Amino acid sequence: MDLSSLRPAKGAVKNKKRVGRGQGSGNGTTAGKGNNGQQSRSGYKRPIIEGGQVPVYRRLPKFGFTPLDKKPVNTVNLTQIDKWIQDGLVENEITILDLKSLLHASNADYFKILGNGELTSAITITAHAFSKSAEEKIAAAGGTVVKAFRTLEEASKVRDLPFEEALLKPKAKLVKRAKKSTKP
């Protein structure tokens, strides 16, 4: 026996059923849909009419909504960060770009550091948010916390600042100004 003689088990591979290809094929004429009527036509869907009974979509209440400003957030625990340090993936600093590559995230994602676990070495971590316990544990290990205000996508659009500075600069808040009247 060699690799060139390997074949799939008998009955494991079936030919695709091609319907509507003549009567001799066994699936011609009506293409497996039976005889005439609404159900044999294209575009037919089984109705959800329940015959006088209040339909399911009206019996069940409406609930919940998705906020328009919801942001995709990737969370990282201190145990994971400590493992990265021990594996040699990061040294004494973790930036947003490091988090993106280590977590396989997109440019639009936010990163939050959670305090599950312990840190064994001092490290500087840049992220968008930190839990209280994470901040305390990082400080206890001799590390520092740097908060970023923009995603990678937003920082790349800032023209007058270098990329690293744009990440850390807060976004400008819109100020509504009263219109000046043109009347004398």
From Swiss-Prot:
Coiled coil: none annotated. Residues 1-45 are annotated as: Disordered. It comes from the Bacteria. One of its GO terms (cellular component) is cytosolic large ribosomal subunit. Disulfide bonds: none annotated. The keyword Lipid metabolism does not apply. It holds the Pfam family Ribosomal_L27A. HAMAP family: Ribosomal_uL15 (MF_01341). Belongs to the universal ribosomal protein uL15 family. Binds to the 23S rRNA. This is Large ribosomal subunit protein uL15. It comes from Pelodictyon phaeoclathratiforme (strain DSM 5477 / BU-1). The lineage of its organism: Bacteria, Pseudomonadati, Chlorobiota, Chlorobiia, Chlorobiales. The gene is rplO.
